Swiss-Prot record:
GO terms for biological process: response to host immune response. InterPro entries: Mycobac_pentapep, PPE_dom, PPE_sf. Belongs to the mycobacterial PPE family. Was identified as a high-confidence drug target. This is Uncharacterized PPE family protein PPE12.
Length: 645
């Protein structure tokens, strides 16, 4: 937060108004109060029960030993209750500091009005007649900047003072767990490896939930409220990626990066869904890569949906610092402009003010559209049908890409709205070949996936069939580990639930190679389960190496049921690098799919068929048989929409 002094009031004010606010702090204060009450009640009850036992019928050395052992626990509970009360008070103090700062910063609408007014004065300052008014607006803007910085400095000081009052928690008493299969101390639950966890199958400390952490490279994860996270201090599930690394301080699910609020974001400090980059507010924002359009770069600081670039406000813009819808270029204010620093609708060129102008530095009305072959109003591209399109071959409103059907798409061959990637069916997808909503990964079928090739929702990991997985190759949900068939596993290649160990068949195991429940030691043999042939397998009747689930045939990273290949999850898939149900491959280029009943290469969705796939095949949506299609029931190549035959 200390970087606020360098940030303009647009950023400081907007962050204060669009952030989570004081509600999480107040909720935390209430939770700490409740915990303090429970701890004090537990201490009182514990002391009363032990006193009655030792002073009643139970006498002798055993009774005395029990009383001596119980005393420290009662004292620890009392002290912990006092610390919880202090945490509640300081959380309320921090909430009060935020509310005071929120009241003190300039409202974002006031800042935006100042900037727009200044811009209008500047573009109309042909003879310098607006210079005094521009200077006055800039002076007001500088005052806004100073006001926000002063308020944020006070907020930082107050919140830091509140945090400084918190004392370190006293060491807990060792070797006390409530549950089975735990390795560590003071866990309430089963199958945890670590300390102070409330839940099942965690690898780390002080998690409230299950399946956090990953046994892959020993990625310990702590202080999460949720399940299936790789990282620390997340409020949600499925954040992080086993290959990219831990993600922390997220509020939401399926994010890769830090301090995101929402789902399926790749990057840091995003607010929304499916953003690829940093500090975006909205859905499906990313950055264009002009040298290789199929591989987008991160987009930063966008507010809106489906923008490809940086600092845009609106939807479907390609470029930087545009305000409006469907612009291509930089610094445009309006809709459907191609070029830079235009004000209006459907202009082609630079520094124009008006509608449908072609050229530069013009003012007026040039026609309903600029560009060629357009039907509608405010289009500046080529061959568009609709309104305010600056791209080519689009059907809809505010598209700056190519061959889109829908609204505010800055990518190409999308069906839907707010897609900045390629060949997506849905809305708010930042990368390519997704079917669904808010995916910043690629080739996903579902919602809020920042990873790739997932069938399900809010997966930060890759090639999962299920939801809220930060690991890879899982069939199930809430897994931080890899290649599991089941739920809440932070270990590897388990069939079952809440295992922090590896290659187990069952539940709540912190050891390895066990068949059963609640084991903290290692079993014997190369496999767990029943009827497996090979090594490193768990489950039932698998053949090969490194499989979990049942009746899988193959080597490495197969989970689920009746799959064959490599890196496969789900049910009855017969092609590698695939998640979902009943997907198949044909030809040399096959796999890399998600969804249901697809055949071919690089597909997502339902029932898509590419009979002769090659390395240019890519399809999303429903029932398509063409190449690089989005939408539904298309049989020709390179189209979006529906029923192109």
């Amino acid at each position: 937060m200390v970087g606020f002094a360098w940030l303009p009031p647009e950023t400081n004010s907007l962050r204060m108004y669009l952030g989570a606010g004081s509600r999480p702090l107040l909720a935390a204060a209430g939770a700490w109060d409740g915990l303090a009450e429970e701890l004090h009640a537990a201490a009182s009850s514990f002391g009363s029960v032990t006193s009655e036992l030792a002073g009643g019928a139970w006498q002798g050395p055993a009774s005395a030993a029990m009383a001596n052992a119980a005393g420290p626990y009662a004292s620890w509970l009392t002290a912990a209750g006092a610390q919880a009360e202090l945490a509640a008070r300081q959380a309320r103090a921090a909430a009060g500091a935020f509310e005071e700062a929120l009241a003190g910063v300039v409202h974002p609408a006031v800042v935006q009005a100042n900037r727009v007014r200044t811009w209008l004065l500047a573009v109309s300052n042909v003879f310098g007649q607006n210079a005094p008014a521009i200077a006055a607006m800039e002076s007001t803007y500088e005052q806004m900047w100073a006001q926000d910085v002063a308020v944020m400095a006070g907020y930082h000081a107050a919140s830091s003072a509140a945090a400084a009052q918190l004392a370190s928690w006293q060491p807990a008493l060792p070797n006390i767990n409530l549950g089975v299969g735990n390795i560590g101390n003071l866990n309430v639950g089963n199958g945890n490896t670590g300390d102070y966890n409330l839940g099942n199958g965690n690898l780390g400390n002080a998690n409230f939930g299950g399946g956090n952490g990953s046994a892959f490279h020993g990625q310990i994860s702590s202080f999460n409220v949720g399940s299936g996270n790789i990282g620390n201090f997340n409020l949600g599930s499925g954040n992080g990626n086993v290959g990219i690394g831990p993600s922390s301080f997220n509020v939401g699910s399926g994010n890769i990066g830090n301090a995101n609020v929402g789902g399926g974001n790749s990057g840091d400090n995003n607010f929304g869904f499916g953003n690829f980059g940093n500090a975006n507010i909205g859905i499906g924002n990313a950055g264009p890569n002009m040298s290789s359009p199929a591989v987008p770069t991160p987009g930063n600081g966008n507010v809106g949906i489906g923008n490809g670039g940086n600092g845009n406000f609106g939807g479907g813009n390609t470029g930087n610092a545009n305000i409006g819808l469907g612009n291509v270029g930089d610094g445009n204010v309006g809709f459907g402009n191609s070029g830079s620093y235009n004000f209006g609708f459907g202009n082609t060129g630079n520094n124009n003010i008006g509608i449908g102008l072609t050229g530069s530095n013009q003012i007026g009305f040039g026609g309903l559209n600029s560009g060629s072959g357009n039907i509608g109003f405010g289009n500046s591209g080529t061959g568009n049908i609709g309104f305010f399109n600056s791209g080519s071959g689009n059907f809809g409103v505010g598209n700056s890409g190519v061959t889109n059907t829908g609204v505010a798409n800055s990518g190409n061959i999308n069906t839907g709205f707010g897609n900045s990637g390629f060949i997506n069916t849905g809305f708010g997808n930042a990368l390519s070949v997704n079917t669904g909503f808010g995916n910043s990964g690629q080739a996903n079928t579902g919602i809020g996936n920042a990873g790739d090739f997932n069938t399900g929702n809010f997966n930060g990991g890759i090639i999962n069939t299920g939801s809220f997985n930060s690991g890879a190759f899982n069939s199930g949900s809430f897994n931080g580990g890899d290649a599991n068939s089941g739920f809440l596993n932070s270990g590897l290649t388990n069939t079952g639930f809440a295992n922090s160990g590896n290659i187990n068949t069952g539940g709540f195991n912190a050891g390895n190679l066990n068949t059963g429940f609640g084991n903290t030691t290692d079993g014997l043999g190369e496999n767990s389960g029943f009827g497996n042939a090979g090594s490193g397998n768990s489950g039932f009747n698998n053949s090969g190496r490194g499989n979990s689930g049942a009746q899988n045939v193959g080597n490495l990273q197969i989970s689920g049921f009746a799959n064959s290949g490599q890196s496969v999850t789900g049910y009855n898939n017969s092609v590698s690098v695939t998640s979902g149900f009943g997907n198949k491959g044909t030809g040399l280029f096959s796999g890399f799919m998600s969804g249901f009943g697809n055949t071919g290469f690089l597909q997502s969705g339902f029932g898509n068929l590419e009979a002769n796939p090659d390395n240019n095949s890519a399809t999303s949506g429903f029932g398509n048989s063409g190449k690089q299609d989005s939408g539904g029931f298309n049989s020709i190549d390179f189209v979006s929409g529906f029923f192109h035959r």
